[in-house]
Amino acid sequence: MRLKIIAAALSAVSAMAGPAAADPGRVLLYNWSGYIAPDTAGRFQEATGKRLVLDTYGEADEAEARLLARGTGYDLAVVSSETVGRLVEAGAIRQIGLSGIPNAAAIDQQLMQLYLDATPQAEGYTLPYLWGTTGIAYDRSAVLERLPDAPLDSWALVFDPANASKLADCGITIVDSVEEVVAAALAYLGLDPQSRSERDIEAAFGVLSAIAPYVRAFDVDQYDALLGGEVCLAVTWSTDGLAPLLEQGTDRYHYAMPREGTNLWADLFVIPSDAGDLEASDQLMDFMLAPEMMAAAARFTNAISSVSVPEAGAGEPGFDSPAAALPPDARGRLYLLPSRSGAEKRLLDRRWRLLQIGM
C-alpha cells in the first residue's frame, strides 16, 4: 500500500503512458507508486531478457476502478487486499496457476490463511507481495508533553476526543482509506472490526465525526510529513509509520499496533482478466517472489516480505521491531478487512467524503 514517492524507484523502469499492445519483449506491471526496489527492472531484464514497463497509482480505489474498466494491457498488477473480492466477483481478474511460480512455495501460509478467512473468494486468484499494518505513528515527546498519561498503545490516543483535542495543535493526520479507518474505530469501540452491521458502522462514524475537527488532513501520502516532523500523530500504514526509524535511525517517532486490534493489510499480485501473456505474468511473479528480490523490496518499502527472508533487515535498526517483523506474539491482535460488496463500499465512500467536508 503503500506510498513512497521516490524518483529513483522509476529510474530503471520504463514508464507506461497508457494501454499498450502485447509485446513479447516486455512485461507490463501495474503497482503502487514507489513500491519496487530501484534495481528490479534491471535485474529482471538481465535474468529474462525482457523489459519491465511500469504504470503506477496512488490510491487503492484508483487501481480497482482501472482493473474493473478492462483493456489495460497489464500482464500483472499489485492491488490492495480489500479490493480483491470485488475484482473476483466482477470477473476482472483471472485465476493463478502455481506450476510456473515455484517461489510461491515459500509464502507465509499463516498470514495467507488469515487473508483467505476474511476473503474466501480470493482463493486461487492472488498471491501476496508485501504485508503491513495500519496503526499509529506518534512523536513521543510531543504527545507526552500534551498528554502525560497518554494511552500510547491504544486507539483511544486518537479516537478519544479529549486526547485528539489536545494533540490538534501539533498535527493529526489520518490515512485516506475508509475501510481501514472504520475498522479501527470499530476495534476501538470493542466491536467486530469486520462488522457489516449498519448500527456498528454508524457507531464507527460517530467516533470519527467527534474527532474530525481536530484532524489536519485525511491523506494517503503521509510519508513526507512523518520524515519531516510535520505532525505529532498519524493513523497510517506501517510502511510510512516506520520510515523515520528504518530510514533515518531516529526514535523520535514510535509506531504502535493498538492493543484493541490492528489491521493487517496485504498488497497482492493479480492477473487482469485481459492479460495477453500469461507466461510473462507468471515469470514476473516468480521473479519478484524470489527471496533476494523480496528482501530488497521489504527493505526499500519498509514492508513485510510475503516469503521467508531472514536476511531482509538483518543488522539494520528497527527491522526487528514487532511491526516490521510480525513475530508470532504480535499476530494475535491482527485482523483483516472483510470483503465488502461494491454497494457497501460506495456507501462507505459517501459517508467518508461527507465526514471530510464536515457534514
Model-predicted regions and their roles:
Residues D23-A90:
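Early extracytoplasmic/lumenal segment of secretory-pathway proteins
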Residues Y74-V79, C232-W237, H254:
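Paired acidic/hydrophobic, glycine-rich loop segments that form the ligand-binding mouth/hinge
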Residues T83-R86, L233-D251:
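A ligand-binding cleft/hinge motif common to bilobed small-molecule-binding domains
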Residues V84, V88-P213, D221:
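Extracytoplasmic ligand-binding site segments that recognize negatively charged/polar headgroups
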Residues A137-A142, A187, W265-D277, A296:
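A bilobed periplasmic-binding-protein/Venus flytrap-type ligand-binding module shared by bacterial periplasmic
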Residues I201-A210, Q248-S273:
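Periplasmic-binding protein-like
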Residues P272-R333:
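Mature extracytoplasmic/periplasmic domains
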Residues P328-M359:
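Conserved C-terminal helix/tail region of periplasmic/extracytoplasmic solute-binding proteins
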